[in-house]
């Protein structure tokens, strides 16, 4: 029993904060008039930017829910949600930098639990009934032992007839307890799975709603860990606390009353010994927790090394560094094994001592009980009942000590999940104005911008650019000059720090983001990401309702139809993860087909051919030239040879427009663009 008290160690953490969004969109296209909308927007844009996350506020419903969940939860309190309890557990993925431990959101939990409340209450009643039967069982055993003892001593009467009554009662108790246990486990399993499923769905939807700035600041591994490990941890804790916590607490209280009823003297001796043992266990446990923490940190280092090596396995193989990575990982694993072995020895020694002490308690109970029997203060059956009830108390208290740690771990895991479920994006997913007539004219009006992760570094400074509808404008410049940032602002992945991005004279911050990205803009970047499904489903990604004929037409326009049909499965060919089974040029053309299927009015080409070989570049360039027809096109170029036919070329330098004009005009000026052309030609000649 005392071994389990080791698992209740607390680490104080700071409260979290939540992401708070500023609602700038409208409810739909039928909202206020455009002038009124612009007036509302002008007031909003001058408001202070909201903090990254809002403070947590306690909810009265949460306190009521804590009562419903049983006294086992109440013993932890609200602060327990900010603690981490664990002796031996897998390492959690933690982002760099200090991160405050989030509070458990009882209000959100209540929303998830409310649909399952009837099943939960039924399970609680069944668990309570099973606990009451467990209290009654030691007393019935005592009656049975008294019958056997009396018959052994007196040899009078019919043994089978006398033992039949207590035995049948005990058998009925066992059967009823088994049925109640089966019932509450089934119900709790259903409640736990449904709550966990709803939690995962809500969390995943919340993550998808977040803007790009959120994913710049958070690691993907951390988010996946929230969806998997944290939800699983919370579900397991929830089910165990309800099933085991209520039963253990009821059994402890009930059996203590039974012990006092059977023998107040023996109960008093037990109450004297128990606090001493618990205190000793807590002292030794603090030492073992330090060993455990070091072992966990070492496991985390080994896991991080393996994750990095496997995530970059192509680079590892490209440099033939498999043996070096194996040596590094083996060294970390050996350190982890050594620390865990030391921890295991400590646990083994303590467990052995605990067993000796607990058995001595049993022996002492028999000795003291025998003395009471000799003075006729206790019968054999009562001593048997006392022993069984005391063992039940020990098991229940040990179980509660484990559950205490499980409660804290579960609340901590749930708090981390609810932290992201409660986030509101600064840029809403939908809602806002939709232009009834779209021409496709773009205006970056005195735009300044800094990434949220680098607030002190301006990527764009007073950037001003007007792109007429139906024209192709190319952005060129050195790496880090802000070219891709311009495309990100047009897609409204971010909002400008200053200035505005306008579409047909309307600030895109009052437009519906889902309409803007889903129908107006087609985006093709340097490294297109495909999904591990069929080619036809990848092309349909932007328009799930598109017919096969429309998909085939988009593929023809993207110069992809011929190579797709050359595969044995054609359009139904399954692609590997991220489309690794296709070449770079093939992936790019599938991405172009995906963008063209939406028939966007605006097309963004972010260095779409820079990573391709000459032959693939030629095939993709033909598709891109075809895609530009009748659309406003923003080209972010690395290879300057691909943009000579653009209507206008913009040279970016230090976040500002340095030069603007046609290819021939800029060459004649002999400025930055001409210098870029000259250097690229020189590099090309040297490469040959």
Curated annotation (Swiss-Prot):
GO CC annotation: mitochondrial ATP-gated potassium channel complex; mitochondrial inner membrane; mitochondrion
Function: ATP-binding subunit of the mitochondrial ATP-gated potassium channel (mitoK(ATP)). Together with pore-forming subunit CCDC51/MITOK of the mitoK(ATP) channel, mediates ATP-dependent potassium currents across the mitochondrial inner membrane. An increase in ATP intracellular levels closes the channel, inhibiting K(+) transport, whereas a decrease in ATP levels enhances K(+) uptake in the mitochondrial matrix. Plays a role in mitochondrial iron transport.
Residues the entry annotates as binding ATP: 477-484
Predominant location category: mitochondrion
UniProt keyword annotation of Transport present: yes
Similarity annotation: Belongs to the ABC transporter superfamily. ABCB family. Multidrug resistance exporter (TC 3.A.1.201) subfamily.
Transit peptide listed as a keyword: yes
Residue intervals of the ABC transporter domain: 442-679
GO biological process, one term: potassium ion transmembrane transport
Membrane topology, as annotated: Multi-pass membrane protein
Transmembrane domains' residue ranges: 115-135, 168-188, 268-288, 342-362
InterPro entries registered for this protein in UniProt: AAA+_ATPase, ABC1_TM_dom, ABC1_TM_sf, ABC_transporter-like_ATP-bd, ABC_transporter-like_CS, P-loop_NTPase, Type_1_exporter
Keywords: ATP-binding, Ion transport, Membrane, Mitochondrion, Mitochondrion inner membrane, Nucleotide-binding, Potassium, Potassium transport, Transit peptide, Transmembrane, Transmembrane helix, Transport
Compartment(s): Mitochondrion inner membrane
Quaternary structure and interacting proteins, as annotated: Component of the mitochondrial potassium channel (mitoK(ATP)).
One term of GO molecular function: ABC-type transporter activity
Segments forming domain ABC transmembrane type-1: 121-409
Transit peptide boundaries: 1-31
Protein's UniProt name: Mitochondrial potassium channel ATP-binding subunit
